[in-house]
Design a protein with these regions (language model features):
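Aromatic-rich, lipid-facing transmembrane alpha helices and their immediate juxtamembrane interface loops
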Residues: 1-144
């Protein structure tokens, strides 16, 4: 079954909160932020929250674009490519000072966190979730 809009939103929220949260806990101490560990954790989790909130908004745009496709879904690889426009928007918002609580973030730290988190979440969504949560796929990507 093709994921529904609400299924995509639920999947994004669950995977970013759980998988992205765990990955952020692991990777933050190794990021070249130049800040204290507490400040680094605050920044990385605020960036993750920004990605989640903007990602939910992106889903509405993606849903509208998918209506022009016969199968009403992206090919799997397109889901990976959306990393580019979403990452660029988050980076521009951070640089513009539009993300509350996030100061100056080095580009290298942002790229390491964003790209690796995106890849981990994408791999989990296209691997273990589809294997271990078979009902998730039959329910249009919804968890509840």
């Amino acid at each position: 079954m093709v994921p529904t809009l609400y299924g995509r939103i639920q999947t994004r929220i669950v995977l970013l909160a759980v998988v992205g949260g765990i990955w952020t806990l692991i990777i933050t101490p190794f990021l070249p932020t130049g800040e204290s560990l507490g400040r680094s954790y605050q920044t990385t989790f605020l960036v993750l929250l920004t990605v989640l909130v903007l990602g939910v908004l992106w889903e509405f745009l993606y849903h509208g674009l998918q209506q022009f496709r016969w199968e009403k879904d992206w090919p799997t690889f397109f889901g990976l490519l959306t990393m580019i426009n979403e990452g660029l928007l988050v980076w521009l918002l951070i640089k513009a000072g539009a993300v509350p609580g996030v100061g100056d973030v080095p580009l290298s730290a942002f790229l390491i966190q964003f790209v690796t988190t995106w890849l981990v979440v994408w791999l989990v969504a296209n691997g273990p979730v589809q294997i271990f949560f078979t009902r998730w796929r039959f329910r249009g990507g919804r968890f509840w």
